[in-house]
């Protein structure tokens, strides 16, 4: 079983702001009623654990290639090659993606 404490970095689907809040609560990264506070705290402390490259809103949303771009970011993070946005001491990363209108989702866990 995977626990929140096992995930060091995550790329979650955030093409719309509400998607990030829904994803982190449904993935168990935070409690359902705490996702807004969690994201606010990440921002205020400059913690890049969630969407270290700025998410889909900040880095772009390449239709048809979103999942692979998120996967590349997590793999690059785990390899220690993310330069300025590198998070230290990573062992486990998570990639979450959704299709149009949330009709399907995928979740992948990568380990170093």
What is the predicted function of each stretch?
Residues 1:
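Extracellular interaction modules
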Residues 4-112:
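Claisen-condensing/thiolase-fold acyl-transfer catalytic domains that form or cleave C-C bonds
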């Amino acid at each position: 079983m995977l626990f929140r404490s096992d995930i060091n970095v995550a790329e979650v689907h955030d093409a719309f702001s509400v998607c990030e809040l829904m994803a982190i609560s449904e993935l168990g990264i935070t409690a359902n009623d705490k996702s807004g506070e969690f994201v606010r705290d990440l921002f205020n402390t400059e913690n890049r654990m969630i969407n270290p490259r700025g998410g889909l809103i900040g880095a772009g949303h390449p239709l048809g290639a979103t999942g692979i771009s998120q996967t590349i970011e997590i793999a690059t993070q785990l390899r220690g090659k993310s330069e300025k946005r590198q998070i230290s001491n990573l062992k486990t990363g998570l990639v979450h993606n959704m299709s149009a209108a949330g009709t399907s989702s995928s979740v992948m866990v990568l380990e170093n």
